């Protein structure tokens, strides 16, 4: 009996292609029995994930790319790999690819393939996957996404951010994005107009959307304002309506559940109210920003009117 290569040895990044196992000498019937007996999970037709490995987006991307090597991970899928924030949770988004050969005609569930050319500088390698570069990724998102989502991605990419528990440096420069959008491709003209709304100082997706909602309501505060308390302590506000002395703070999704975190929050807000420029303070959660923006802007407007 011919000795067979172990299935795990044939896997690539935890993904086994059926065709690879068959080519190595596994009979089809024996292969199916072995996959089920060992606990492999089917990702899609022709691809399996090894036992104990989650079928997460990177693993699913790998399966699609192994089956279709010419495809390049792109758009929101590439953004997630570069740790560029968007408004769509990675687990809910379709897998997105570009086919630079313009020849892909297949259909895969929960996968979108765009047929468009790519320059050599548009493609990078990360985690063993071929994907669009940060610059190309941001340009594609600006061309294809709605305004708020596009600007969340842009502002995430041009500044330092903590994403997934790790801090990363800026990935692109704003002038490089502007140059990348200079060509007359679909969506570029609209994207160039949106560049004027970008604030590289934004610290989170919630801050980006809050600022856009305020702008839509004709409320235009200063953002990321540095102030000092009478004791010389530095405080950076999310937003400040300086004439009215109104500070606006946006809290992220993370729940500060520890006693020490709560103490720091209380101390920070006390320090804000000690600043001579601040006479009142409004705090909103990310949920307020995303789900009740009209109420948020109404409260801000009422506070501004009360301040005279």
Task: Specify the residue positions occupied by each region the protein language model found.
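Surface segments flanking catalytic/ligand-binding clefts of nucleic-acid enzymes
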Residues: 1, 12, 25-30, 161-308
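Short gly/ser-rich loop at a beta-strand->alpha-helix junction or flexible surface loop bordering the NTP-binding
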Residues: 1-187, 308
